[in-house]
């Protein structure tokens, strides 16, 4: 039995930046000021639980902050303008760990609105990133999740229309939705697939290749991770067996029955340690060898960190 690792996999630059910002803040202010994070810093159970053990308090609203002397960190997914304003009124120090690629979408949405465009957002309802984008503009945004949503759209002025997208969507699904939007509204403007995060695209392209050369694919990532779920969907769409797991403890050996080659990848919010533990578990229990997929590559993207 052989393990084949996808490349690239795991942490993207935006997730690494957010996790590092939280770790540095915690180290700088430990024993002095309480560190809060609005929602999960990234969608990964291992990361969140690790920070909880170090004293970080994760809150679901600004009202949950008990100590106004505390420090509040906005997660990688970004927040609405109203939440920013509420934090200012609360008087807490804010450190923004929003992924720069998400911030780019915020600016695009505002720019379209300022130019008088009616806006469509391609994204998943209730995802924190989507809530943040919607909350960056004053006028209502039409949310599109499926092709059927495109057909159901009620638009005031089809000739004055723009769209933006969530950064962690399926490239293939989004491409179809954009094509349908352009077919129905020929004058619509938008960024094509440029708003889909580079890491999301790279991991989806890699997992497609991985599915072709393996019998079963294991995706390391949390159930609430949008990009991890898209990797799962992609594998299943190819007809391959695929499973999304938080860590090696979630493994079921029956999943691997009849498999000679096991593909392993990880969502953009899953740390390397979880992949390493899974590989070690399989090496010990299944007598496997390990290789990296052909044509893989290492990402070299880095984002500037917030100054504080």
From Swiss-Prot:
Instruction: Specify the pathway.
Output: Isoprenoid biosynthesis; dimethylallyl diphosphate biosynthesis; dimethylallyl diphosphate from (2E)-4-hydroxy-3-methylbutenyl diphosphate: step 1/1; Isoprenoid biosynthesis; isopentenyl diphosphate biosynthesis via DXP pathway; isopentenyl diphosphate from 1-deoxy-D-xylulose 5-phosphate: step 6/6
**Catalytic activity as recorded in UniProt:** isopentenyl diphosphate + 2 oxidized [2Fe-2S]-[ferredoxin] + H2O = (2E)-4-hydroxy-3-methylbut-2-enyl diphosphate + 2 reduced [2Fe-2S]-[ferredoxin] + 2 H(+); dimethylallyl diphosphate + 2 oxidized [2Fe-2S]-[ferredoxin] + H2O = (2E)-4-hydroxy-3-methylbut-2-enyl diphosphate + 2 reduced [2Fe-2S]-[ferredoxin] + 2 H(+)
Query: What are its E.C. numbers?
Result: 1.17.7.4
**Cofactor binding description:** Binds 1 [4Fe-4S] cluster per subunit.
GO molecular function annotations of the record: 4 iron, 4 sulfur cluster binding; 4-hydroxy-3-methylbut-2-enyl diphosphate reductase activity; metal ion binding
Q: Which cysteines are joined by disulfide bonds?
A: none
InterPro entries reported for this sequence = LytB/IspH (IPR003451)
Q: What does this protein do?
A: Catalyzes the conversion of 1-hydroxy-2-methyl-2-(E)-butenyl 4-diphosphate (HMBPP) into a mixture of isopentenyl diphosphate (IPP) and dimethylallyl diphosphate (DMAPP). Acts in the terminal step of the DOXP/MEP pathway for isoprenoid precursor biosynthesis.
For this chain, the family text in UniProt reads: Belongs to the IspH family.
HAMAP family named among the record's database cross-references: IspH
Q: What is this protein called?
A: 4-hydroxy-3-methylbut-2-enyl diphosphate reductase
What organism does this protein naturally occur in? Answer: Wolbachia pipientis subsp. Culex pipiens (strain wPip)
